[in-house]
Design a protein with these regions (language model features):
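N-terminal export signals
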Residues: 1-10
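C-terminal alpha-helix/helix-terminus motif
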Residues: 4, 386-394
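Conserved PLP-enzyme active-site core in the AAT-like
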Residues: 11-38, 42, 69-81, 88-274, ...
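A glycine-/small-polar-enriched, mobile loop at the entrance of the PLP active site in fold-type I
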Residues: 29-66
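Generic structural marker for isolated residues within well-ordered, non-membrane alpha-helices
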Residues: 48, 69, 293
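Flexible, glycine/charged-enriched surface loops at secondary-structure junctions
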Residues: 61-66, 80-81, 253-257, 276-285, ...
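A glycine-rich beta-turn/hairpin centered on an aromatic-Pro dipeptide
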Residues: 289-294, 319
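Conserved C-terminal alpha-helix-loop-beta "cap" of PLP-dependent enzymes
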Residues: 297-389
Length: 394
């Protein structure tokens, strides 16, 4: 049958050719976490099936986006919702919504024409981070504050938004006070909670707390498509965010296209995630960490402990330390050997580094194993390889 005559249902039937193998791409075991550079999470089988089914039929994109948003808003207990091209896209589109609201302007006016416009976004100095480039795409100017008095005094006619980085461990102003002061000045509050599920209830905790907009990554804890995300919040702001997004032409979000497969996949992932239990997930992750630790218990001088970060990636991680005078290999060298091995294994990037990663404590003497993105049985593969590398250097 020729390609032009083959129905879509036939084209996607079966597993098909393995293009990773065809392209010579190395498959890995992900003992790191939901990092973008490692293709984030694995979609569960029901989500994969929903994506494949969505690929079989064309639809009207805005009808799909609208109905998906309405469905998600009901499930996630908020006024309105939309599927975005990841959390960074949600940050840009939410900021664009606040900019166009404050300036009573059209999407095509941003960000090329900000001269004389209202474009100030308040943020705690301790909440500045690499990802705030997604906000700066809209032509905003950050105004940094540290104390509640600074914050109160920073509002003026040019203030369009107050931004909060949910996972930040520093900063003097908590969520409730951040919201209260902004709302006193009739300014919307945006919370970047990209990596902050589980727990499942965080999907509605922050909007119910009073944040006007909240961004989540779709391809992390929710286990949706890697290039999908969620923007939740006030109906008027979600409407403006939608107007600033693809498929509309002259707007800041034109390059942030979300395909039908990603929209359906994100909805399916939310359905799947809401069917899970926080307790069951945490118990399974704890078991994986315990199994790895038990397999390493007789490595000389080795000590292990399990740490759960306080906000982002709030799941058990295994931290391993040992005397490098007895086990003569550094954590960074262990990570390199596991990466080069077969199968190739990636450890958490906090391994062997003085700075922690996403709330995980670490130093040059610590191996960090993320267990929550492991597939069944992979925990013991990681355990065996760690043991091989460590014991071969004693």
């Amino acid at each position: 049958m020729s390609l032009s005559a083959a129905p879509a249902s036939d084209l996607v039937a079966g597993e098909g050719e393995d293009y990773y193998d065809k392209l010579g791409v190395t498959k890995i075991i992900n003992a790191a976490g939901t990092y973008t550079i490692l293709t984030a999470s694995m979609m569960p089988a029901p989500v994969q099936a929903a994506v494949a089914r969505a690929a079989k039929h064309p639809v009207r994109l805005m009808e799909l986006q609208t109905k998906a948003g309405e469905y998600l808003a009901k499930r996630l207990r908020c006024e309105a919702a939309m599927v975005t091209a990841g959390a960074a896209s949600a940050l840009t589109l939410g900021t664009a919504a606040c900019m166009t609201l404050a300036n009573k302007s059209a999407p095509h006016d941003m960000p090329t024409d900000v001269t004389g416009s209202n474009n100030e976004v308040l943020v705690q100095k301790a909440h500045r981070y690499d990802y705030d480039h997604a906000l700066r795409n809209c032509g905003i100017r950050f105004v940094e504050v540290e104390t509640i008095a600074d914050y109160e005094a920073a509002f003026n006619d040019r203030t369009v938004m107050a931004h909060f980085f949910n996972a930040a461990q520093q900063g003097q102003i908590g969520r409730e006070d951040w919201i209260r002061v902004a709302h006193k000045h009739s300014v919307p509050c945006f919370n970047d909670a990209a990596a902050d599920v589980p727990p499942i209830s965080n999907l509605w905790n922050y909007t119910q707390m009073g944040f006007d907009l909240v961004a989540f990554s779709g391809g992390k804890g929710i286990r949706g498509p890697q290039n999908a995300g969620l923007l939740l919040g006030r109906k008027d702001l979600i409407s403006r965010a939608t107007a600033n997004n693809s498929p509309f032409d002259d707007c800041v979000g034109r390059g942030m296209k979300v395909a039908k497969e990603q929209i359906v996949g994100m909805v399916a992932a939310v359905d799947w995630f809401l069917s899970q239990s926080d307790e069951a997930m945490q118990t399974e992750f704890q078991r994986r960490a315990d199994r790895i630790a038990a397999h390493l218990k007789d490595v000389p001088t080795l000590q292990s402990r399990i740490v759960v970060p306080p906000v982002a990636n709030q799941v058990p991680h295994l931290l391993i330390r040992y005397d490098q005078q007895r086990v003569k290999v550094s954590p960074l060298a262990v990570a390199a050997q596991l990466r080069r091995g077969t199968p190739s294994i990636e450890l958490n990037p906090a391994t062997g580094r003085n700075e922690g990663s996403a709330g995980l404590p670490s130093d040059v003497s610590t191996i960090v194993v993320g267990v929550w993105m492991l597939e069944p049985g992979e925990d013991m593969i990681v355990a065996r390889r760690l043991r091989e590398v460590l014991t071969s250097n004693t």
